[in-house]
Amino acid sequence: MATLFVENLTVADFSYLHPKRGMVGESWLVDLELTGDLDHQGMVFDFGHIKKRIKQIIDDSVDHRLLVPVDSEHATVSERDNNTSLEWLYRGGTIRMVAPSESLLLMNGPEISKANLTLFLMDLVQQVVPDNVAEVRIVLREEDTGTAPFYHYSHGLKKHDGNCQRIAHGHRSGIHIFENGRRSRYWEKLWADRWEDIYLGTEEDLEGTYYIEEIPHHRFRYDAPQGHFELVIPEDHCYLVDTDTTVEQLAGHIAEQLAAEAPGKHFRVRAFEGIGKGAIAEAGENMPGKTHSGWLSGAAVI
């Protein structure tokens, strides 16, 4: 038998529910190995088919969804007419969500982990590979950012035509901040702490704030092409902006906030959206009241 491998086959950008942290945005790289007999072409499986079939099935099942461990004592889930209602009780408060069922992945087990998601994906992939493939191996891993700060955020983009419109999906994202041309770990750490396990909400989508068990919670709701979305989440796990939460606008927001917090200085922000892609914005002394945003992309598969 022979084994072929594909590193960085795709990036799974999603959010999941945690009993202590609440809603957590995540980005995991997916590596794949297939072991089996060679076919008539002398291959285990054509690389072109891997990208078409296997990448697609992984993206369709996990990417831009909220992963829910339905066997957890923290979860209450019901489904009706292609919509799912969810309540998640955790240390920080209560998360409630109503959304089209396709925007969630309900997983067996008491928690979401690399181990159980890996098994889930291997079972899916096994269904689409040819009979000569005897073994499927998948590795899920975070991007290696060294000591550079990063944050986990969740959000939804109601105006997006694709799956970004889903109200609870997320990313694990790095941030690079340059103050007067020099990289500043101080500001990077400040924003990484500020947006740790955060939900980034648009003020326009905020219906109101009310108390559950004496804890203030925000309620967001909107209609999008895929259907109606509602989310209730503790106020102190939210950060509100007056724009949509696209990475271009988030980069601009961070740059403008930095310029306001440190007058007289110039800032350049590279804000990532998951792995290998993001936006650049500048603000400060050389361009008062303005930001310049642009898209950045790395070598990772997106």
Language-model features: where?
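Charge-rich, low-complexity N-terminal segments
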Residues: 1-302
